[in-house]
Amino acid sequence: LAVVESNFNPDARSSANAVGLWQFMSYTGKSFGLARSWWHDERYDPEKSTVAAAKYLKHLHKRFKGNWELAMAAYNSGSGTVRRAIRKAKRAGKPTDYWSLKLPRETRGYVPAFYAVATIFKDLEKYGFEPLPQLMDLPPKRAVVVAGGVPLKQISEVLKIDSQTIRLYNPSIRL
């Protein structure tokens, strides 16, 4: 789903102000444990936002009675949008599966996009793609707590680490 959401770009921002790898809106991110302030936004943190996305998807999967297609549609457009489409279909005596619902255009293409990406990722070479590179081994992380308001340049100088490296390890810092 992260490919469909952001093309694996942790700095992605949508026109609706959903941000990060998993394209969390502010309220949804907060609801699933992602902190946000004027200098820090965990929606941009790949590790923390992935944990939050897993929790959110689990919640949606349960809400839509084990139906992953409806859960993914709700991840994209909101559970209220999907619930309203289901109610409308029921009132009209129509099926309530993902493929039959009247959903927003973007959401109608969301699950097929996920299936397409999943199919390609299962056999990249068959579809003309290079195998994925191995993930680089990053050195172990160590947390250093810094008082708010300390300029990144000062942190960089004290730790003797360039600001780009600090940003690499701390993608949730908003500069």
Where is each model-derived feature located?
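Short, surface-exposed glycine/acidic/tryptophan-bearing loops
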Residues: A12-G33
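Extracytoplasmic and endomembrane cell-envelope/extracellular-matrix remodeling and assembly machinery
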Residues: S31, R36-F64, M72-A73, S77-L175
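Short alpha-helical scaffolding segments that buttress acidic/His motifs in well-ordered protein cores
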Residues: L1-A2, Y75
